[in-house]
């Protein structure tokens, strides 16, 4: 082996190093191997004529080239096929992603390949490490949920409901709606369902709310400190833990950074929640804070909308085995922290966490945002377009990098990612890129998908967020103008009209014109009718109904995925019968499974008719007392109560008198106040005093009664010890009503809020005379009662009735007497005609009151049972004896039973007499000897007391009202 020295060659030029190599190509294959940081050796086959070795010491640029690689690759030999099929051209991969290409007659060339993947390695398990969860929890304060510096921190709009239906699985006793395989809109846009969704209670899209954390344990690693280990196997995208901590703003974040640095805290636990908001889990949090960093992670962090808050969770990136450490790529600048060494041990490890080393080499955008922007990784772009996207340069901003890459066109499947990213987007340049993808799309299916994925609600929030930038506003209005417009339902639900309305006067001519045209188009749409959703009370106790769910536990039952109701149904080709050759005249379903269904009565009875049963036969009756064996086909006649017409006429007369009295009552003339000349205070005072004129008559009477009450109470207090308390209160109310009605009837009330001194004296005098008479009557009643008790005369009930009438005589006062008291106050007690007149009117009032009470009792009491039918037919097995006492005995002896008894049905009367066609002795089981015995008696009593005479087969009643022949 001969060495080759070339000390004058530049160390930084890799091309010169390759060109300086002198390689002789022979028939055999030549391999060139360059190790990372090692020597480069050129080997030949056994028949080679010469060999040449190039070391890294000779060309220092080789070391720089090898050390500059980010991803290390294994060496491989990739031949290049030529047109004649000979593998004369060779590709040799040296360290990392560098390949040496050698072609006949051409110097070797170095090329960089970006499509090589990291070699898959088996996951490293940490089952040998002990569980250090208790020790780790002692280093911080455990929290269940995030705390917020103020109520506006972490706030986001949420008024969206999914269209999924409840899917109850009886075998699991769970609601499987909104699962991973479903088409749930909320789940696709990273929104959790709340209690008022149509998918039912406790659906599968409530993982944050129910804290469905994975089974994990804290372990203590050798170099990374505490870490998180999976105790069970995890499936892809499974929710592992929520990142819980204190949500603070940017000023507090920077202050805590300095504070923790002064305290000597090396490990910071800050995560960016949104623009200007951070989650600090340094001193308060949960086990999610122990999830370490890795350059090849098995987890990822995602943000979800839960209610009105934005929350952060850790999810599985791939299938994870039990014992693996749970890690995710921080992929962000550590907010000014110094870069730390990375101990993940992955082949693609950058060597540092945070700082410029990691930030400049990779974008800070999350994978979800990159996919939403249409920027895929290099491997995916190799199969999509011819031109591969370039990598991010050192020091290049994310916005500049995204601008330099052409995004993919938006398809129907990509709408979900775009709308989910737009829902949580707080960066303007990212929002503009996402909106541009939607705006450039002309496919109607994609636009329908955008509307379905809460398009109006999400664009409404973006319109509110960027309303000061007219370019972004105009971009959103153009998207809204391109939406398919069928109904106004989604527009009303999103409340976007109230956001667009102020834009018509914003000052920008383009925005004003576009907003006005959009509102005009929306106004022409109709509102589609939808069944209103039942409002659930969250505090109500859940009542389980036995008819709520029908749980079938058969093995053949299969669960259908929850699909959106707006999705078009699948079209199936029509099919013929399963077995067309089978012919059967028998019933299709001869076996009944379960309880029989309730069958409604085929031919119900006409209104007013009821049915009863006697000796196995059915007869019909009505409330008036009519009975028949024949089924009626017309409604039953109404039963007339005796004296009903007279009472109706009397009531109608009373109503007419009241109406006529109201018409004859003169209306008060409202005095129009003049133009106020006083100050504003006087005008407002007069307005308050005259307000009673706008009240109704009933309210004015109540106001006037309250004005009279103090003067009436003054008199009532004088009679406290002379009358019982209850009687005194009742008399006071009655006398107040009498005075108020009398004064209003005679137009003596000028102002119901005040009365003059003269009126006060008259009121007191009237009340004093009234109560004096009441006391005298009460004493007389007590004296008579004592005498009757001493003599043992009438019963106590009679005394109570007479006493009641006496008291009523004192209470009932006429309006004429009140007028007389007002005209002549001093002569009220000495006028016998007024007293007699009052007594006569009181007697009339008591008579009318008694009649009204009797009518009320008659209405509320049970109606009189109808009269019994004619006697039973001849030849019955059992007949009433001549000493029968009435209807009850007759029913008991004939064994009458109810067949159909509605709630309002009267007591069924006995069955009617059978006609000739119904009097078959053999069928009814009657005895001819009993019939002959009754005929020999010539007469027998009927249930109502009439006597019937039996002569030659003819029965006739001695009283009017019952006729018929048997």
From Swiss-Prot:
<feature type="compositionally biased region" description="Low complexity">
    <location>
        <begin position="1"/>
        <end position="13"/>
    </location>
</feature>
<comment type="similarity">
    <text>Belongs to the class V-like SAM-binding methyltransferase superfamily. Histone-lysine methyltransferase family. SET2 subfamily.</text>
</comment>
<dbReference type="InterPro" id="IPR003616">
    <property type="entry name" value="Post-SET_dom"/>
</dbReference>
<feature type="compositionally biased region" description="Pro residues">
    <location>
        <begin position="905"/>
        <end position="914"/>
    </location>
</feature>
<keyword id="KW-0805">Transcription regulation</keyword>
<feature type="region of interest" description="Disordered">
    <location>
        <begin position="540"/>
        <end position="595"/>
    </location>
</feature>
<feature type="compositionally biased region" description="Pro residues">
    <location>
        <begin position="863"/>
        <end position="874"/>
    </location>
</feature>
<feature type="domain" description="WW">
    <location>
        <begin position="603"/>
        <end position="634"/>
    </location>
</feature>
<dbReference type="InterPro" id="IPR038190">
    <property type="entry name" value="SRI_sf"/>
</dbReference>
<feature type="domain" description="Post-SET">
    <location>
        <begin position="338"/>
        <end position="354"/>
    </location>
</feature>
<dbReference type="Pfam" id="PF00856">
    <property type="entry name" value="SET"/>
</dbReference>
<dbReference type="InterPro" id="IPR036020">
    <property type="entry name" value="WW_dom_sf"/>
</dbReference>
<keyword id="KW-0808">Transferase</keyword>
<dbReference type="GO" id="GO:0046975">
    <property type="term" value="F:histone H3K36 methyltransferase activity"/>
</dbReference>
<dbReference type="InterPro" id="IPR044437">
    <property type="entry name" value="SETD2/Set2_SET"/>
</dbReference>
<dbReference type="InterPro" id="IPR017923">
    <property type="entry name" value="TFIIS_N"/>
</dbReference>
<feature type="region of interest" description="Disordered">
    <location>
        <begin position="782"/>
        <end position="966"/>
    </location>
</feature>
<feature type="domain" description="AWS">
    <location>
        <begin position="157"/>
        <end position="212"/>
    </location>
</feature>
<feature type="compositionally biased region" description="Basic and acidic residues">
    <location>
        <begin position="782"/>
        <end position="823"/>
    </location>
</feature>
<dbReference type="InterPro" id="IPR013257">
    <property type="entry name" value="SRI"/>
</dbReference>
<dbReference type="GO" id="GO:0005634">
    <property type="term" value="C:nucleus"/>
</dbReference>
<feature type="region of interest" description="Disordered">
    <location>
        <begin position="67"/>
        <end position="92"/>
    </location>
</feature>
<dbReference type="Pfam" id="PF08236">
    <property type="entry name" value="SRI"/>
</dbReference>
<feature type="region of interest" description="Disordered">
    <location>
        <begin position="1"/>
        <end position="20"/>
    </location>
</feature>
<dbReference type="GO" id="GO:0032259">
    <property type="term" value="P:methylation"/>
</dbReference>
<dbReference type="InterPro" id="IPR046341">
    <property type="entry name" value="SET_dom_sf"/>
</dbReference>
<dbReference type="InterPro" id="IPR035441">
    <property type="entry name" value="TFIIS/LEDGF_dom_sf"/>
</dbReference>
<feature type="compositionally biased region" description="Polar residues">
    <location>
        <begin position="672"/>
        <end position="687"/>
    </location>
</feature>
<feature type="domain" description="SET">
    <location>
        <begin position="214"/>
        <end position="331"/>
    </location>
</feature>
<feature type="compositionally biased region" description="Polar residues">
    <location>
        <begin position="924"/>
        <end position="934"/>
    </location>
</feature>
<keyword id="KW-0949">S-adenosyl-L-methionine</keyword>
<dbReference type="Pfam" id="PF08711">
    <property type="entry name" value="Med26"/>
</dbReference>
<dbReference type="InterPro" id="IPR001214">
    <property type="entry name" value="SET_dom"/>
</dbReference>
<feature type="compositionally biased region" description="Polar residues">
    <location>
        <begin position="67"/>
        <end position="87"/>
    </location>
</feature>
<keyword id="KW-0539">Nucleus</keyword>
<dbReference type="GO" id="GO:0006355">
    <property type="term" value="P:regulation of DNA-templated transcription"/>
</dbReference>
<feature type="compositionally biased region" description="Basic and acidic residues">
    <location>
        <begin position="548"/>
        <end position="559"/>
    </location>
</feature>
<dbReference type="GO" id="GO:0140955">
    <property type="term" value="F:histone H3K36 trimethyltransferase activity"/>
</dbReference>
<protein>
    <recommendedName>
        <fullName>Histone-lysine N-methyltransferase, H3 lysine-36 specific</fullName>
        <ecNumber>2.1.1.359</ecNumber>
    </recommendedName>
</protein>
<keyword id="KW-0158">Chromosome</keyword>
<keyword id="KW-0678">Repressor</keyword>
<comment type="function">
    <text>Histone methyltransferase that trimethylates histone H3 'Lys-36' forming H3K36me3. Involved in transcription elongation as well as in transcription repression.</text>
</comment>
